[in-house]
């Protein structure tokens, strides 16, 4: 079992092994700006298009798009999880496809089906790619991508859907600024004492993370973070709603203040840690769940770690929570002496 060494979080040599993924995280804001600039011309063509009967989204970040659009979209919205399209989709509908990698076979089948049925197709993909070739039709608008960043492509797509009056206004530049701020705050050159991602990594060093996000977007970020923590540590990490996490928290015996940290290392390693992703949502049910989780953790001497960001739009808050968590996962990997692949 790997032992966490917090000195590695400020060790230049140890951090060099994670440089590629840290650099990619730090460049997230720049990727959003590039994708936005490249897609500006096709997005300017969107306001003149007729309102569709329904919107069907497919590809990476389709559920993220749904989380943003569902509360305000004036037409039915479906996030389609598999290849092809529902049988009812036709020429009156808009098919939205995120394919920043450009070549997933299932999405190619979806695009082919949309073109065959004469649906309006709005696709984010590389200009020169297999899927772009299949997307060619009079009813297709391509938002070109070049960075293979699913979130950057999704933010550009949200900008386009706003121009179609199907979603809320999104300011890609402010989302990019938020990403830049996270990169600065969580920089490998920032000391542990002022770096929220390194601080979280230290909090998660010897525990089993139980990750919770109350709002739809925070819950999505919690699932993404749990995936990253599993990859970083090789240990279990669970993201779930409050009703699923409470029985786990309540079943944990309070910690023994007289336990030997060396002799009892195995059992201590398995103690859970409650990780809260708080985007400032003031819904009474969400705040109630937050209170119940914290109270259960405190009763049983369970550590609570929080990532919070209350400023900006829904998309900015989501991006900030997620990106901070991604940096923390990398630092957890560094502290455990593991190689984390991007």
PLM regions and their residue ranges:
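Active-site phosphate/pyrophosphate-binding segments
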Residues: 12-24, 29-45, 146, 162-266
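Short helix-loop-beta junction
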Residues: 66-78, 227-238, 295-301
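Short, highly selective alpha-helical patches that border small-molecule cofactor pockets
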Residues: 25, 62-66, 107, 222, ...
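A generic structural motif
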Residues: 77-84, 124-126, 235-247, 303-312
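Glycine-rich phosphate-binding loops that contact phosphosugars or nucleotide phosphates
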Residues: 48-184, 279-280, 291-292
């Amino acid at each position: 079992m790997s032992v966490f060494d917090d000195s590695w979080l400020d060790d230049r040599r140890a951090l060099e092994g994670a440089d590629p993924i840290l650099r990619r995280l730090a460049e997230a804001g720049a990727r959003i700006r590039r994708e936005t600039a490249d897609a500006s011309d096709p997005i300017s063509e969107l306001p003149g298009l007729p309102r569709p009967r329904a919107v069907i989204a497919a590809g990476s970040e389709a559920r993220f798009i749904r989380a943003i659009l569902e509360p305000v979209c004036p037409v039915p919205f479906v996030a389609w999880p598999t290849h092809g399209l529902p049988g009812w989709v036709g020429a009156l509908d808009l098919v939205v496809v995120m394919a920043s990698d450009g070549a997933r076979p299932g999405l190619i089948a979806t695009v082919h089906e949309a073109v065959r049925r004469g649906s309006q197709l709005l696709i984010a993909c590389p200009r020169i790619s297999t899927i772009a070739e299949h997307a060619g039709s009079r009813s297709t608008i391509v938002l070109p991508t070049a960075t293979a960043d699913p979130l950057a492509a999704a933010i550009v797509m949200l900008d386009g859907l706003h121009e179609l009056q199907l979603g809320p206004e999104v300011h890609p530049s402010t989302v990019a600024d938020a990403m830049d701020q996270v990169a600065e705050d969580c920089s490998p050159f920032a000391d542990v004492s002022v770096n929220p991602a390194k601080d979280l990594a230290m909090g998660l060093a010897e525990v089993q993370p139980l990750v919770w996000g109350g709002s739809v977007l925070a819950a999505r970020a919690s699932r993404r973070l749990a995936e990253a923590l599993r990859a970083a540590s090789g240990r279990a990490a669970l993201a779930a709603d409050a009703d699923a996490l409470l029985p786990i928290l309540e079943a944990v015996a309070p910690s023994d203040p007289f336990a030997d940290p060396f002799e009892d290392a195995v059992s201590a390693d398995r103690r859970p840690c409650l990780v809260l992703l708080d985007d400032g949502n003031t819904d009474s049910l969400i705040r109630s769940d937050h209170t119940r989780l914290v109270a259960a953790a405190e009763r049983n001497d369970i550590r609570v770690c929080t990532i919070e960001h209350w400023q900006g739009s829904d998309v900015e808050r989501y991006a900030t929570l997620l990106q901070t968590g991604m940096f923390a996962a990398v630092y957890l990997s560094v502290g455990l002496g593991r190689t984390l692949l991007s």
